[in-house]
């Protein structure tokens, strides 16, 4: 992370040093003259001399002023008289100082008022530029904060978009003109020079370390042509169409004749998403549950750990041990998948849930959780097909009726597929019109479908309906919080996350989402504390986590923690964030 002189900040518009030079080189003589008309004239005539008009110039001016003009035109004669009066005041004549830098330092704060042209650049550069330009004392910059979207207990950030960090509200409070201390420009120049030298040294080191690659013009032209073709929209469409045609050819005779249409859809969409690979178990020396006596069931121990509020990482190790005893343990795979997604380890959770469905294709809990994880990772069609498989398993009569009414359903795009599956869930919801018989899982599935279409108000209504049936469900409270956060209702989202954590204090995902919302409302220290708390829950007591727990690591917590430290302008803390860091070094300043 470079605060100055790196990346895009090296551009003319983005470099704080360049902006500073531009501000200091502006001609402020007119502003100085206006500011100095009241009271004593400042001693800064180095930029502007009080020259008297010669005879020839005065004659030209008189000729210009006395030309005939329309009666309604602006009269310049009174203004000329006023200008001459001001210009010939005895107090306005001072000896020109020889040292221009001393002259510049002696400027009064009121003479430095200017409105600099807005420049694009990083928040750090913008702050530096405003500091050096000496904006008016009453000016405050308050920008609407950007948001990284929270996960809906596994929801993807901002509907599949990458987490973007935007500038948070920064209020620059300045004293009144008569209270402002004089700026020590010599020290400012010295500091800027030192920063520039350091940036040049870093750039030189990076240049020396990077291998020197010489590319001739012909090769560069060929590469550019290929690159442009790869980035063209037509190439992307052709690639996707070709991939799907290849899939249809390979699967034409691969489906059994008696396979239901929804099963074919699930097989089609699930095969076109990325393969997350087999689940990676922790090393043997890291898992104390592998050494349990035969009469002790690690699966039951894992359930007890979850019920008693132990760390999710410890429960995950217990379920891993149960699976390593019996690799076909469906319930252990299900619980392992649920625990890892709640522990902010999405990919590990997906691998476990997929293995559960491989052993038990109609497991409704695994289907619902896997659909949400697919949404979080951006595989919408796979999520919709998984939800259709869920409702086909729990409400087969609804799906069969829909197939009979439209036997030639071949939805290819995500919007048509979403609409089709949403109609199935709405039909299922109509089977239970009153709250007493309402299916909370149907409401949750509807909420996921509306969330994928960014219909957050409907999503919130669905999750609230589900909570009316299961008010003590921490996962539902977390999902409600994520929906509220994506509706720009961060304060309400914080309340929902706190409710989830009251019910389940070890819920790492809710703690992560809470940290994100705290950043969005400008509570950076609180955000850091929640994120550090989540990271501490990834550690297992009695195990050297730095050297042993190397699998299924999550980077979302550490990356968001970096953003919190950047917002706090704490580069010293930012440099401490790295893999396998010692969290105790933060305990002196943060409570977690």
UniProtKB/Swiss-Prot annotation:
Cross-link Glycyl cysteine thioester (Cys-Gly) (interchain with G-Cter in ubiquitin): where in chain:
10
Locate the motif WxxxF/Y motif 1. Answer: 100-104
**What spans are recorded as compositionally biased (Polar residues)?**
22-46
**Crosslink (Glycyl lysine isopeptide (Lys-Gly) (interchain with G-Cter in ubiquitin)) position:** 22
Q: Where is this motif: WxxxF/Y motif 3?
A: 185-189
Q: Where is this region: Amphipathic helix 1 (AH1)?
A: 11-33
List each coiled-coil range: none
Q: Which PROSITE patterns match?
A: TPR, TPR_REGION
Could you state a single Gene Ontology molecular function term?
A: protein-macromolecule adaptor activity
Q: Name one Pfam family in it.
A: TPR_16
Repeat among the record's keywords? yes
Q: Where are the annotated segments for Amphipathic helix 4 (AH4)? A: 223-239
Post-translational modification, as annotated? Monoubiquitinated at Cys-10 by PEX2 during PEX5 passage through the retrotranslocation channel: monoubiquitination acts as a signal for PEX5 extraction and is required for proper export from peroxisomes and recycling. When PEX5 recycling is compromised, polyubiquitinated at Lys-22 by PEX10 during its passage through the retrotranslocation channel, leading to its degradation.
The record's subcellular locations are: Cytoplasm, Cytosol; Peroxisome matrix
Sorted alphabetically, which SMART domains does this protein's record hold?
Answer: TPR (SM00028)
Q: Which positions does the entry assign to TPR repeats?
A: 295-329, 330-363, 440-473, 475-507, 509-541
User: Segment Disordered: which positions?
Assistant: 22-49
GO biological process terms held by the UniProt record: fatty acid beta-oxidation; fatty acid metabolic process; protein import into peroxisome matrix; protein import into peroxisome matrix, docking; protein targeting to peroxisome
Residue interval(s) of motif WxxxF/Y motif 2: 128-132
InterPro entries assigned to the protein according to its UniProt record, in alphabetical order: PEX5/PEX5L (IPR024111), TPR-like_helical_dom_sf (IPR011990), TPR_rpt (IPR019734)
Reproduce the free-text note on domains from the UniProt record. Answer: The TPR repeats mediate interaction with proteins containing a C-terminal PTS1-type tripeptide peroxisomal targeting signal (SKL-type).
Task: Quote the protein name from its UniProt record.
Answer: Peroxisomal targeting signal receptor
Organism name: Candida albicans (strain SC5314 / ATCC MYA-2876) (Yeast)
């Amino acid at each position: 992370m470079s605060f100055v002189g790196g990346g895009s900040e090296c551009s003319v518009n983005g470099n704080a040093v360049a902006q500073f030079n531009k501000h200091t080189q502006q001609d402020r003589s007119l502003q100085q003259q206006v500011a100095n008309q009241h009271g004593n004239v400042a001693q800064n005539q180095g930029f502007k001399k009080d020259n008297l008009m010669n005879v020839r110039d005065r004659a030209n001016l008189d000729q210009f002023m006395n030309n005939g003009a329309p009666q309604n035109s602006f009269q310049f004669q009174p203004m000329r008289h006023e200008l001459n009066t001001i210009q010939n005041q005895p107090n306005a004549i001072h000896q020109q100082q020889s040292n221009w830098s001393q002259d510049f330092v002696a400027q009064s704060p009121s003479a430095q008022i200017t409105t600099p042209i807005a420049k694009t650049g990083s928040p750090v550069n913008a702050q530096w530029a405003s500091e050096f330009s000496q904006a008016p004392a009453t000016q405050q910059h308050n920008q609407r904060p950007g948001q990284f979207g929270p996960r809906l207990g596994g929801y993807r950030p901002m509907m599949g978009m990458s987490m973007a960090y935007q500038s948070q509200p920064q209020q620059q409070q300045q004293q009144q003109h008569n209270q402002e201390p004089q700026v020590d420009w010599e020290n400012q120049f010295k500091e800027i020079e030192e920063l520039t030298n350091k940036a040049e040294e870093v750039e030189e080191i990076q240049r020396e370390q990077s291998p020197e690659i010489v590319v001739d013009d012909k090769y560069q032209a060929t590469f550019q042509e290929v690159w442009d073709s790869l980035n063209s929209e037509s190439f992307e469409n052709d690639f996707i169409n070709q991939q799907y045609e290849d899939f249809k050819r390979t699967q034409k005779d691969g489906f059994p004749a008696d396979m239901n249409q929804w099963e074919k859809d699930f097989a089609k969409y699930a095969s076109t998403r990325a393969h997350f690979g087999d689940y990676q178990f922790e090393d043997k020396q890291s898992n104390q549950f592998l050494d349990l006596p035969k009469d002790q069931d690690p699966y039951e121990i894992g359930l007890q750990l979850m019920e008693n509020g132990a760390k999710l990482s410890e429960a995950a190790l217990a379920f891993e041990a149960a699976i390593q005893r019996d690799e076909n343990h469906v319930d252990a795979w299900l619980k392992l998948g649920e625990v890892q997604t709640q522990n902010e380890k999405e990919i590990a959770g997906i691998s476990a849930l997929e293995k559960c469905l491989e052993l038990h294709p109609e497991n409704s809990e695994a289907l619902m959780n896997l659909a949400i994880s697919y949404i979080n990772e951006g595989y919408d069609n796979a999520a919709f097909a998984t939800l259709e498989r869920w409702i086909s398993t729990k409400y087969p009569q609804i799906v069969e009726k829909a197939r009979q009414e439209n036997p030639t359903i071949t939805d290819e795009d995500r919007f048509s597929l979403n609409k089709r599956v949403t109609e199935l869930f709405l039909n299922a919801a109509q089977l239970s019109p009153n709250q007493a018989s309402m299916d909370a899982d149907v409401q949750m599935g509807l909420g996921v479908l509306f969330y994928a279409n960014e219909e957050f108000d409907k999503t919130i209504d669905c999750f609230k309906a589900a909570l009316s049936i299961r008010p003590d469900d921490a996962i539902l409270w977390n999902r409600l919080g994520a929906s509220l956060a994506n509706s720009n209702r961060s304060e309400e989202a914080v309340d929902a996350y706190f409710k989830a954590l009251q019910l389940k204090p070890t819920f790492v995902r809710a703690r992560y989402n809470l940290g994100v919302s705290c950043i969005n409302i400008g509570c950076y220290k609180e955000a850091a504390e929640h994120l550090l708390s989540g990271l501490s829950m990834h550690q297992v007591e009695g195990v050297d986590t730095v050297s042993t727990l190397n699998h299924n690591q999550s980077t979302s917590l550490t990356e968001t923690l970096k953003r919190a430290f950047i917002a706090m302008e704490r580069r010293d803390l930012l440099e401490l964030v790295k893999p396998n860091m010692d969290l105790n070094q933060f305990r002196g300043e943060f409570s977690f």
